[in-house]
Amino acid sequence: FSYETVRKALFKYLDLECAEPDAVKIPELPFRPPVLCAGCPHRASFYAAKVATKGMNAVYCGDIGCYTLGNAAPLNMVDTCLCMGAGITIAQGLTLAEPGKKCLSFAGDSTFFHTGIPGVINAVYQNTDITIVVLDNHTTAMTGQQPHPGTGVTAMGEKTKALDIETML
Protein backbone atom coordinates (compact mmCIF):
# COMPACT_ATOMS: atom_id res chain seq x y z
CA PHE A 1 0.00 0.00 0.00
CA SER A 2 1.14 3.53 -0.67
CA TYR A 3 1.52 6.16 2.01
CA GLU A 4 -1.46 8.04 0.62
CA THR A 5 -3.73 4.95 0.66
CA VAL A 6 -2.85 4.17 4.29
CA ARG A 7 -3.24 7.82 5.32
CA LYS A 8 -6.73 8.09 3.82
CA ALA A 9 -7.81 4.75 5.34
CA LEU A 10 -6.63 5.82 8.82
CA PHE A 11 -8.40 9.18 8.62
CA LYS A 12 -11.59 7.46 7.45
CA TYR A 13 -11.35 4.83 10.22
CA LEU A 14 -10.75 7.51 12.86
CA ASP A 15 -13.58 9.59 11.38
CA LEU A 16 -11.28 12.57 10.84
CA GLU A 17 -11.27 15.08 8.03
CA CYS A 18 -8.60 14.12 5.52
CA ALA A 19 -7.27 17.41 4.17
CA GLU A 20 -4.73 17.27 1.40
CA PRO A 21 -1.25 18.10 2.71
CA ASP A 22 0.39 21.30 1.51
CA ALA A 23 2.79 20.73 -1.33
CA VAL A 24 6.40 21.08 -0.32
CA LYS A 25 8.33 23.49 -2.47
CA ILE A 26 11.63 21.93 -3.39
CA PRO A 27 14.41 24.51 -3.34
CA GLU A 28 16.46 24.97 -6.47
CA LEU A 29 19.84 23.37 -5.94
CA PRO A 30 23.04 25.09 -7.05
CA PHE A 31 24.92 23.64 -10.01
CA ARG A 32 27.63 21.20 -8.95
CA PRO A 33 29.86 19.71 -11.62
CA PRO A 34 30.77 16.03 -11.27
CA VAL A 35 34.11 15.58 -9.52
CA LEU A 36 36.25 12.79 -8.12
CA CYS A 37 35.36 12.08 -4.50
CA ALA A 38 37.30 13.79 -1.72
CA GLY A 39 40.19 11.53 -0.76
CA CYS A 40 40.04 9.58 -4.03
CA PRO A 41 43.51 8.16 -4.83
CA HIS A 42 42.94 8.77 -8.55
CA ARG A 43 43.32 12.53 -8.06
CA ALA A 44 46.96 12.09 -7.06
CA SER A 45 47.54 9.54 -9.83
CA PHE A 46 46.24 11.94 -12.48
CA TYR A 47 48.28 14.80 -11.02
CA ALA A 48 51.46 12.68 -11.04
CA ALA A 49 50.85 11.71 -14.67
CA LYS A 50 50.19 15.35 -15.56
CA VAL A 51 53.47 16.46 -13.97
CA ALA A 52 55.40 13.56 -15.56
CA THR A 53 54.10 14.36 -19.05
CA LYS A 54 54.41 18.15 -18.86
CA GLY A 55 55.82 19.47 -22.12
CA MET A 56 55.23 16.19 -23.95
CA ASN A 57 52.84 15.87 -26.83
CA ALA A 58 50.66 13.49 -24.80
CA VAL A 59 47.20 12.04 -25.33
CA TYR A 60 45.33 10.63 -22.34
CA CYS A 61 43.03 7.74 -23.19
CA GLY A 62 40.39 7.14 -20.57
CA ASP A 63 37.95 4.39 -19.85
CA ILE A 64 34.60 3.89 -18.17
CA GLY A 65 34.67 4.24 -14.40
CA CYS A 66 34.66 6.94 -11.78
CA TYR A 67 38.13 7.95 -12.99
CA THR A 68 36.44 9.21 -16.19
CA LEU A 69 35.90 12.30 -14.05
CA GLY A 70 39.61 13.01 -14.53
CA ASN A 71 38.47 14.74 -17.73
CA ALA A 72 37.27 17.78 -15.79
CA ALA A 73 39.23 20.83 -14.68
CA PRO A 74 41.63 21.24 -13.08
CA LEU A 75 42.97 17.80 -14.08
CA ASN A 76 41.92 17.66 -17.77
CA MET A 77 43.50 14.21 -18.04
CA VAL A 78 41.05 12.30 -20.25
CA ASP A 79 41.09 13.13 -23.96
CA THR A 80 39.19 10.05 -25.13
CA CYS A 81 36.52 7.88 -23.54
CA LEU A 82 34.47 5.41 -25.54
CA CYS A 83 33.51 2.29 -23.61
CA MET A 84 34.75 -0.11 -20.96
CA GLY A 85 38.13 -1.48 -22.03
CA ALA A 86 38.64 0.82 -25.01
CA GLY A 87 41.27 3.13 -23.48
CA ILE A 88 44.17 0.69 -23.91
CA THR A 89 43.32 -0.13 -27.51
CA ILE A 90 42.58 3.49 -28.44
CA ALA A 91 46.05 4.41 -27.14
CA GLN A 92 47.51 1.73 -29.43
CA GLY A 93 45.65 3.06 -32.46
CA LEU A 94 46.64 6.66 -31.74
CA THR A 95 50.29 5.65 -31.37
CA LEU A 96 50.19 4.12 -34.84
CA ALA A 97 48.21 7.02 -36.36
CA GLU A 98 50.34 9.74 -34.76
CA PRO A 99 53.81 8.38 -33.93
CA GLY A 100 54.97 11.68 -32.41
CA LYS A 101 52.47 11.53 -29.57
CA LYS A 102 53.00 9.89 -26.20
CA CYS A 103 49.86 7.89 -25.43
CA LEU A 104 48.83 7.03 -21.90
CA SER A 105 45.91 4.80 -21.10
CA PHE A 106 44.06 4.98 -17.78
CA ALA A 107 42.03 1.96 -16.67
CA GLY A 108 40.63 1.11 -13.29
CA ASP A 109 41.43 -2.21 -11.67
CA SER A 110 37.95 -3.56 -12.30
CA THR A 111 38.01 -2.47 -15.95
CA PHE A 112 41.49 -3.98 -16.30
CA PHE A 113 40.21 -7.40 -15.20
CA HIS A 114 36.91 -7.25 -17.07
CA THR A 115 37.94 -5.88 -20.46
CA GLY A 116 41.48 -4.47 -20.35
CA ILE A 117 43.53 -7.67 -20.52
CA PRO A 118 42.89 -8.33 -24.25
CA GLY A 119 44.17 -4.82 -25.02
CA VAL A 120 47.30 -5.47 -22.95
CA ILE A 121 47.88 -8.75 -24.80
CA ASN A 122 47.56 -6.96 -28.14
CA ALA A 123 49.88 -4.14 -27.04
CA VAL A 124 52.56 -6.66 -26.05
CA TYR A 125 52.04 -8.76 -29.18
CA GLN A 126 52.22 -5.70 -31.47
CA ASN A 127 55.13 -4.19 -29.47
CA THR A 128 53.18 -0.94 -29.14
CA ASP A 129 54.85 1.89 -27.23
CA ILE A 130 52.12 3.03 -24.85
CA THR A 131 51.97 3.63 -21.12
CA ILE A 132 49.20 1.78 -19.31
CA VAL A 133 48.22 3.24 -15.94
CA VAL A 134 46.01 0.95 -13.86
CA LEU A 135 44.24 2.97 -11.18
CA ASP A 136 43.86 0.33 -8.47
CA ASN A 137 41.54 1.08 -5.56
CA HIS A 138 40.87 -2.63 -4.89
CA THR A 139 37.16 -2.54 -5.75
CA THR A 140 34.58 -1.77 -8.38
CA ALA A 141 33.88 1.63 -6.86
CA MET A 142 31.56 3.32 -9.32
CA THR A 143 28.83 0.69 -9.25
CA GLY A 144 28.71 -0.42 -5.64
CA GLN A 145 31.96 -1.94 -4.35
CA GLN A 146 31.60 -5.30 -6.09
CA PRO A 147 34.60 -7.64 -5.89
CA HIS A 148 36.76 -8.42 -8.91
CA PRO A 149 39.64 -10.89 -9.48
CA GLY A 150 42.09 -8.56 -7.73
CA THR A 151 40.14 -8.45 -4.46
CA GLY A 152 40.48 -12.09 -3.40
CA VAL A 153 36.73 -12.44 -2.97
CA THR A 154 34.37 -14.03 -5.50
CA ALA A 155 31.04 -12.53 -6.52
CA MET A 156 29.44 -15.03 -4.12
CA GLY A 157 31.57 -13.74 -1.22
CA GLU A 158 33.95 -16.70 -1.04
CA LYS A 159 37.62 -16.03 -0.31
CA THR A 160 40.04 -16.93 -3.09
CA LYS A 161 43.50 -16.00 -4.33
CA ALA A 162 43.66 -12.37 -5.47
CA LEU A 163 45.27 -11.82 -8.85
CA ASP A 164 48.07 -9.26 -8.76
CA ILE A 165 47.89 -6.65 -11.52
CA GLU A 166 51.58 -5.75 -11.38
CA THR A 167 52.58 -9.41 -11.75
CA MET A 168 50.22 -9.80 -14.69
CA LEU A 169 51.72 -6.79 -16.46
For the regions a language model picked out, list residue spans one by one.
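Generic hydrophobic alpha-helical segments
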Residues: 6, 10, 49, 90-91
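Generic structural hydrophobic/aromatic packing signal, biased to beta-strands
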Residues: 6, 37, 60-62, 123, ...
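Thiamine diphosphate
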Residues: 71-169
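Terminal amphipathic helices with adjacent charged low-complexity linkers/tails
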Residues: 1-20
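Active-site diphosphate/adenylate-binding microenvironment
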Residues: 18-87, 97
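Gly/Ser/Thr-rich loops at beta-strand to alpha-helix junctions
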Residues: 1, 38-43, 111-112
